[in-house]
Amino acid sequence: MAVIKLDEVNKNFVNEVIEAGKLVLGEDIVKSIKACYQCGTCTGSCPSGRRTAYRTRKVLRKVLLGLDDVLDSDDIWYCTTCYTCYERCPRDVKITEIIKTLRNIAAQKGNMALAHRKTASYVLRFGHAVPANNQIVELRGKLGLPAKSPTAQFSEKDLEEVRTLIKELKFDKLIAFDWEKMDLKE
């Protein structure tokens, strides 16, 4: 077990997380982290935790202890946002919302999982996070659906609107997107 050195602790970290999350989620939601007493129900319920080293309780504990290195960790990106922990928590801690807040803070600092950046790049390239390939178009036809779904992927005008919005929000910079290559920067 690692030793926690007081000079490495950000005593304001939990309040910074609450402040960052309250704008979008409401203060009561993110402030619920303070009710966590580390029972482990979240970790025991987590489908990601069964297949990876992800431990929800550990993430919350790091926040409560002021260990802001959690923002540099892959752990916050392993959460599938299934809300199982959220629904089972005996203290009504809004765990999934706290994880999403941590992701937002991490992303603003330039720390984002490659898989999330790639998915975001599909939105910039195709107007859809999961673009339809030839197999999907063929399957849609067999099901009696129009070959092209009504998404920005198949509408140049809508795709340009999506791209304009992304540029205005500087989301392309956040994921390090190269417009010339139409792909992520290496």
UniProtKB/Swiss-Prot annotation:
One of its GO terms (biological process) is anaerobic respiration. Its EC number is 1.8.98.-. Keywords: 4Fe-4S, Iron, Iron-sulfur, Metal-binding, Methanogenesis, Oxidoreductase, Repeat. Pathway: Cofactor metabolism; coenzyme M-coenzyme B heterodisulfide reduction; coenzyme B and coenzyme M from coenzyme M-coenzyme B heterodisulfide: step 1/1. [4Fe-4S] cluster 2 binds at C46, C79, C82, C85. [4Fe-4S] cluster 1 binds at C36, C39, C42, C89. Its cofactor is [4Fe-4S] cluster. Pfam families: Fer4_8 (PF13183). It comes from the Archaea. Coiled coil: none annotated. This is CoB--CoM heterodisulfide reductase iron-sulfur subunit C 2. It comes from Methanocaldococcus jannaschii (strain ATCC 43067 / DSM 2661 / JAL-1 / JCM 10045 / NBRC 100440) (Methanococcus jannaschii).
